[in-house]
Amino acid sequence: MAVVVEEGVVLNHGGEELVDLPPGFRFHPTDEEIITCYLKEKVLNSRFTAVAMGEADLNKCEPWDLPKRAKMGEKEFYFFCQRDRKYPTGMRTNRATESGYWKATGKDKEIFKGKGCLVGMKKTLVFYRGRAPKGEKTNWVMHEYRLEGKYSYYNLPKSARDEWVVCRVFHKNNPSTTTQPMTRIPVEDFTRMDSLENIDHLLDFSSLPPLIDPSFMSQTEQPNFKPINPPTYDISSPIQPHHFNSYQSIFNHQVFGSASGSTYNNNNEMIKMEQSLVSVSQETCLSSDVNANMTTTTEVSSGPVMKQEMGMMGMVNGSKSYEDLCDLRGDLWDF
């Protein structure tokens, strides 16, 4: 019995294995190591054995019985297996067992050694209970490794045509059983909101600044503006409009913008102002055409207003002194 160490793996050529791995060590080879260190050696020498790999006939063993036949492993179990052909001259493999069958899934994966050197292929299979096509899928999965490319069987001698493969079998845990179930909270545990008391603080606007200053204007101080169309004037003098513009601004502020009074009084005061201004113009010899225009304006006015205008005209054009005229102008400006 000879014990040989090859590339860090303890191999036993015949007899029982003599090596026991210390605690903490696990047998977890890569895909390339399975092809180059184990399968190739088994194909070249059928008597080749490994400490961590046993031999099994997958057509006569159920997947849940394989862990008992394994030499090593806790979750993954490795075996050397021979393909069972359905027909002597065919390439199809018999994958049925007594209680079910192995079904290939997905695409075969290429296994390379070094830089682009194809050495093998890996096929994934899932075990189904019953018979196809109505089998029941289980969580037992198998990875089947075979030689390909450089290590293909066609490049090996005829004695190696038995087509050995390496199978890795494991039970895939269901994610729903490994994770803790979600705990449901009953509706009664939630705080009930029977009223709007919990959101009163959201409706409190006392902390917000007012949109309008309350002291700016009270209800009694609000003006009652009445739309009044100001009278039009037809004056051809280049100097007279200046005086009318000045007085018109006064009327717009004190007469038309006032909340009290009537339209009749406003028009009456306007005519008095016009007559006084015309008299001043005649005394200063600024314009000789204003009289005619003002006369026309007086004739258009109503009866009561005409009487007041004539009285005003008599007062201005009568035997009044120059001082009285100045006092009249002062009163007009004060108005």
UniProtKB/Swiss-Prot annotation:
InterPro entries: NAC-dom, NAC_dom_sf. Residues 119-178 bind DNA. It is found in: Nucleus. SUPFAM superfamilies: NAC domain. The keyword GTP-binding does not apply. Transmembrane segments: none annotated. Its main location: nucleus. Pfam families: NAM. Keywords: DNA-binding, Nucleus, Transcription, Transcription regulation. The keyword Transcription regulation applies. Residues 21-172 form the NAC domain. It comes from the Eukaryota. GO terms for molecular function: DNA-binding transcription factor activity; transcription cis-regulatory region binding. GO terms for cellular component: cytoplasm; nucleus. The NAC domain includes a DNA binding domain and a dimerization domain. Binds to the promoter regions of genes involved in chlorophyll catabolic processes, such as NYC1, SGR1, SGR2 and PAO. This is NAC domain-containing protein 87. It comes from Arabidopsis thaliana. The lineage of its organism: Eukaryota, Viridiplantae, Streptophyta, Embryophyta, Tracheophyta.
